[in-house]
Every structure is written in structure tokens, then in C-alpha cells.
Curated annotation (Swiss-Prot):
Transmembrane segments: none annotated. One of its GO terms (molecular function) is actin binding. This is Arp2/3 complex-activating protein rickA. Residues 313-441, 461-517 are annotated as: Disordered. Its main location: other. Residues 500-517 have a biased composition (Polar residues). The lineage of its organism: Bacteria, Pseudomonadati, Pseudomonadota, Alphaproteobacteria, Rickettsiales. Residues 463-479 have a biased composition (Low complexity). Residues 319-340, 347-378 have a biased composition (Pro residues). Recruits and activates the Arp2/3 complex, which in turn leads to actin polymerization, promoting Rickettsia motility during infection. Residues 406-423 form the WH2 domain.
Length: 517
């Protein structure tokens, strides 16, 4: 009966916060009015707003209404868009946080909230829901519940990670009760101005880790006691006895909480040492033990985890190579140079391979000749330059591409309008070899152009020379042909000889390239 009275007082104090939650539920029903069942819930919300007596039965009806809203939204998620689902989840999460903040101010109200949530969850899961929908509803109700495991997910300094956080949950509830007692004490002595300022600081302590919650609450409580000591004349006579009992009770609660924290930490330290003792020797484990010992010796100094992890890394880093005198880092060592000849002059690179012949089998003109090699150095200079030459690299010119020379115009001028014929030379004599498959010369009358003119001139010259030789009787012919009798040739014989000579000239002209178009 006493607990229910305290709950009713708390609900009356949180009237504005409850009205805000009801307006959010009403707005959520309006945004999703197309879903079946939300209109009835909206009517229930309006009836809850009209009731001014905020009691424990009213609070249970209120929690059941919110649970029904969650059930309808999860059952009808297929009818909603992704944006609507995100918006609904955001509003529901805000509603859950506000309800839990109200309930955590009173341990009986918090217990009643948990019982009502479990009851509603069991009733709703019995309805027509699929397996996925039941899992989704469980997730929604899990965020709505208060479980001890929620403290195991909080970020705490190693090695203060508590897997089983039931003891911390008890300390957290005890600190909430102490906080409520301090607020009641300040409200009973509201005539003291200094306490009104402290009351705001107490109300600002929210969602803290138990240990930091204790530190903040303990510091504020010391200030409250100082105010009572310094302003004892302002304390009303009717409140002196109750103030004394309340102050003694709060001191005992804070002392027990602090002692329990120390006991939890010592037990955890002992468990960690027992686990480490069973493991094989390891430098990393020894560093963890030393860090744990330092943390327990001085709680004011945090564990320098980053500094301890940086030490083994320093040993693995290779020291940089020392810089030379001019503080310029030396370049990487060059590859070994090619061996030098006896005169210490690097040999010229091998000549590049000849380019392939074009289709007409005529080689392209050779590239320009390379520059002449430098004159040989004196022996003294060669000795002085021999050392730095060993440390330098000789660039190979063989890998460099040859300069491209455009010979298309030149080849066009050489080839002319007619295709050139391939000429083969005898390797022994160096003279051109006549092909057996070449066509015989045609009649002189078939010649045309300049070739026929050259042939006539050659015939005239031959006829003139033969007639002059036969008429004059040159001494060279007599000396060479002493044993032969001098015979005169007829005109037919001379014509046959001239025809044979003209054919030879024609064959010679056809084999040589013509530069006349």
C-alpha cells in the first residue's frame, strides 16, 4: 500500500512528461491511420488524456496501449514504406526512453513496469504472428525492458569489463533510491536558497555508468551537507529530526555502495589473476598484470594502454641508416658496371641489327654515321677516373630506338613508273648472272622511244668502224691477226653482225635501271 502511494505521487509529479508521451502516441496513430486497429487505440489514448488521476492502474493501461501500438505496426509492416517504418521506429524508441526515465525514479514503479511488459508480451505473441514477426516483436520489447545485461555493453576501462552485471544493476538501483532521497530532502528544505541550485545538479544526473553515477552523486551530497552545516539557523524546527534521520540514512547508503564497488573490483582482479596464472608464461600477459596492478594502486591515473602497446613496437622498428656528413641521404647502390678493357675506356655498344628489307627487296639507305669516339685519355687521367667510373652506370645504347627515316619519296624516285628487276651477282666474279628464264630480245623494229634511237646510233657506229677497219687496214688488226688472211665481208654479213650487236645492247639497257621517265 505504501509503495502504491509513492508511485501515485511520482506519477503526479511526472504529469507533463506523461502528457507528452500520450501526444506522441496519438500522432503516431494519425500517421498510420490506414492500418487496422489504430483508430481504436487513438480513442483509448484520448480517454487516458482526459483522466487527471494518474495512478498505478492508469499507468498499466497506458503501458498496454503502447504495447498494442507496437503489435499493430509490426504486424502490418508489409503495408508500410521503408521511410514510414524508420519514422515509426524512431518515435517508438523515444517513447520507450521517456517511459523508462520516469520508471527508474522509483524502484516499485520500475518493477511494476517490467511485470506489465512481460505480461503484454506473452499475450501478444499468442496472436496470429509469423516467426519473423515474433522475433521482431521480441526485439522491440527487449529495448523496452530493463535487464542487467545492458551494463555489460557499456564501454568501461579494462580490466573492468563485467560479463555478469547483476551486482552492478543492484548498485545502480540503490544509487537511484539515494538520489530520490536527496531530492526529497532538498524539497523539504526549499526555504534554503543554496539547496535550490544543488537541486538542478541532482536532476541532471542521467544515464550514467554506476561508478561515475556514484562519484557525481557523492560530490553533490557533500555539498548538501555543507549547506546544512553553514545554514543551520535557516532549518525549520519541524524538519530538524527528519533531516537528521535522512542524512544518516543517505550516508549509510553511499558508504555501502562504495564498499560494494571496491569488493566487486577486488573480486574481478582476483579472477583475472587466477586466469592469467593458468596460462603459459607470456610477456604480453605480464604487461597486463603490471597494468592491472598500477591501476589498482592509483585509480586517479588511467591505464596507459596505448603507451604499453607502443613499447614492443619500438623494438621491432629497424633504426634508420646514418646520413653522410652533408645530411643528404645516399642514393640506392647502382648495379655492377660492365667490365672495362685494359685501357680503361668503355667499349662501344654493339651495332644495332639491320632493319628488314621492304617489299621491293631494295635496302633502305643506311642511318647517319655515329659521332667519332673521343680521343683516348692519357694514362694518368685514366687512373684518376677509374674509381668514379666503377660506381657509375654505363647506359647501353643498344636498347634505344633507332631514329626513323622516311625513305618513301626516295624509293618512289628510284623505282619510277616501272618495277625494278632483281639482279643477282656471282659471289666469285662479282658480275651479274643472266637468268635462263629471261625472255629473248625481240626484233629491233619492236623497240620504241629512246631505246630505238640508241640502238640505231650503235649500229651506225659499228658499221662505220668496221668499214674503216676493212678499208684502211689498221696495223693493230694486222699485228693481232697475222696468221689470218684478210677477207672482205659482204653487205648481208655486215647486216647480220649489226643485228646481233643491237640485240646485245638492247639486253644490256633492259637490265640497267632507267632514270628517264
Amino acid at each position: 500500500m505504501v509503495k502504491e502511494i509513492d508511485i501515485n505521487k511520482l506519477l503526479a509529479q511526472e504529469n507533463n512528461a506523461l502528457n507528452t508521451i500520450l501526444s506522441q502516441v496519438n500522432e503516431l496513430c494519425k500517421q498510420n491511420k490506414q492500418l487496422q486497429g489504430l483508430i481504436e487505440i487513438q480513442n483509448e489514448t484520448k480517454e487516458l488524456e482526459k483522466e487527471h488521476n494518474r495512478s498505478l492502474p492508469w499507468f498499466k493501461r497506458f503501458v498496454k496501449t503502447v504495447s498494442n501500438v507496437k503489435y499493430i505496426l509490426i504486424k502490418s509492416e508489409e503495408q508500410l514504406t521503408n521511410e514510414a517504418i524508420k519514422y515509426n521506429n524512431k518515435i517508438l524508441k523515444d517513447i520507450d526512453n521517456k517511459i523508462y526515465n520516469i520508471a527508474e525514479k522509483s524502484a516499485p514503479l520500475k518493477q511494476a513496469l517490467q511485470e506489465e511488459i512481460e505480461k503484454n508480451f506473452k499475450d501478444l505473441t499468442k496472436k496470429d504472428l509469423s516467426k519473423d514477426q515474433r522475433a521482431r516483436l521480441s526485439e522491440v520489447f527487449f529495448s523496452y525492458k530493463s535487464k542487467p545485461e545492458r551494463f555489460s555493453a557499456l564501454h568501461m576501462t579494462n580490466p573492468l569489463q563485467f560479463i555478469n552485471a547483476e551486482a552492478l544493476e543492484k548498485q545502480y538501483n540503490s544509487l537511484n533510491a539515494t538520489k530520490q532521497n536527496i531530492q526529497n530532502l532538498i524539497s523539504a528544505n526549499s526555504n534554503i536558497k543554496e539547496l535550490k541550485e544543488i537541486q538542478k545538479q541532482v536532476a541532471e544526473i542521467r544515464a550514467e555508468v554506476p561508478h561515475t553515477f556514484f562519484e557525481k552523486l557523492n560530490n553533490i551530497w557533500q555539498n548538501v551537507k555543507n549547506v546544512f552545516v553553514n545554514n543551520s539557523e535557516q532549518v525549520l524546527a519541524k524538519n530538524k529530526e527528519s533531516n537528521t534521520r535522512t542524512i544518516r540514512k543517505i550516508d549509510e547508503q553511499l558508504y555501502k555502495t562504495k564498499h560494494k564497488f571496491e569488493e566487486l573490483i577486488e573480486n574481478k582482479e582476483r579472477n583475472i589473476k587466477d586466469i592469467i596464472a593458468k596460462l603459459p608464461d607470456n610477456e604480453k600477459l605480464q604487461k597486463i598484470v603490471s597494468n592491472l596492478t598500477n591501476h589498482m594502486a592509483s585509480q586517479k591515473e588511467p591505464i596507459l594502454a596505448n603507451a604499453s602497446l607502443a613499447k614492443p613496437l619500438e623494438n621491432n622498428i629497424t633504426p634508420p641508416s646514418p646520413l653522410p656528413e652533408n645530411n643528404i641521404p645516399s642514393p640506392p647502390p647502382p648495379p655492377p658496371p660492365s667490365p672495362l678493357p685494359e685501357n680503361n675506356i668503355p667499349s662501344s655498344p654493339p651495332p644495332p641489327p639491320p632493319p628488314p628489307l621492304p617489299e621491293n627487296n631494295i635496302p633502305s639507305p643506311p642511318p647517319p654515321p655515329p659521332p667519332p669516339p673521343p680521343p683516348p685519355m692519357a694514362p694518368a687521367q685514366a687512373e684518376t677516373l677509374s674509381k668514379p667510373i666503377e660506381s657509375t652506370t654505363v647506359k647501353k645504347l643498344a636498347n634505344q630506338p633507332r631514329p626513323s627515316i622516311d625513305t618513301s619519296d626516295l624509293m618512289r624516285e628510284i623505282a619510277g613508273p616501272k618495277k625494278l628487276k632483281k639482279v643477282e651477282f656471282d659471289p666469285n666474279t662479282g658480275k651479274p648472272v643472266a637468268h635462263s628464264h629471261s625472255k629473248p630480245a625481240q626484233n629491233v623494229n619492236a623497240l620504241s622511244g629512246l631505246e630505238s634511237i640508241f640502238a640505231r646510233r650503235a649500229v651506225i657506229k659499228v658499221s662505220d668502224s668496221s668499214s674503216s677497219e676493212s678499208d684502211s687496214g689498221n696495223w693493230s688488226d694486222v699485228s693481232v691477226n697475222r696468221n689470218k688472211s684478210k677477207m672482205l665481208k659482204t653487205k648481208g654479213e655486215r647486216d647480220a653482225k649489226m643485228t646481233t650487236h643491237a640485240q646485245k645492247i638492247n639486253n644490256r639497257n633492259s637490265q640497267n635501271p632507267s632514270f628517264v621517265r
